């Protein structure tokens, strides 16, 4: 499904050039749940942003099926993101002035190919994450765990081919973090492909495969023991 070939990402300023990703080669199979770990500044978020086409590689190829995303222009990438990707952020990134139902519907805002009733799709996404009873509430009326579940509903409502989660439990207490991980695990069991950045070894162990990064490189890869 996904193949990164010799990906490099360099940032240049007037005084120094920083290399965030160094010769990264990675494959992610359809239906996989991959966890990315490593110390702060190792390139985890840059790798996730590259997978999300938010950050463009300086060199290398990013194959998504038969498409080389590294060669696409910004307009084509924006269309690709809207159709194929779902994002879950550590800070939730919900819009305060919108209800949870309206926030969830934002996952369809830039989709022109959505079949069926959009309201039903939104309701189904909220039900999947156990937040339907909060549909008419605003983000500030929800706990952190509920807000993250709403953010996951927004990510999955468009039925993306790939879900990218950046520290999805980072702002949550243990109980809410476990609930979010249970949701992600259930989504993966249902066929969703997920790539997650985390600092939690126990949460990484819930993924099917884990890679470790250091200084912009993938230094280890291991499948979960069954």
Residue ranges and their predicted role:
Residues 1-213:
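ABC family nucleotide-binding domain
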């Amino acid at each position: 499904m996904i193949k990164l070939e010799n990906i490099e990402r360099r940032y240049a300023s007037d005084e120094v050039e920083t290399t965030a990703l160094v010769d990264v080669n990675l494959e992610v199979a359809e239906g996989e749940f991959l966890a990315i770990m490593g110390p702060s500044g190792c390139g985890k978020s840059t790798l996730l942003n590259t997978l999300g086409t938010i950050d463009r590689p300086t060199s290398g190829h990013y194959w998504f099926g038969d498409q080389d995303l590294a060669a696409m222009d910004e307009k084509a990438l924006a269309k690709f993101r809207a159709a194929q990707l779902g994002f879950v952020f550590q800070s939730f990134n919900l819009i305060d002035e919108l209800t949870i139902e309206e926030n969830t519907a934002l996952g369809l805002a830039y989709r022109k190919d959505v079949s069926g009733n959009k309201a039903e799709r939104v309701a189904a996404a909220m039900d999947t994450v156990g937040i339907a009873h909060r549909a008419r509430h605003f983000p500030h009326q929800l706990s952190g765990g509920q807000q993250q579940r709403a953010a996951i509903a927004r990510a999955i409502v468009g039925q993306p081919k790939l879900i990218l989660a950046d520290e999805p439990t980072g702002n949550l207490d243990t109980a809410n973090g476990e609930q979010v991980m249970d949701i992600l695990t259930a989504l993966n069991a249902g066929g969703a492909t997920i790539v997650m950045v985390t600092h939690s070894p126990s949460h990484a162990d819930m993924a099917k495969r884990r890679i470790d990064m250091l200084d912009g490189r993938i230094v280890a890869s291991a499948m979960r023991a069954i």
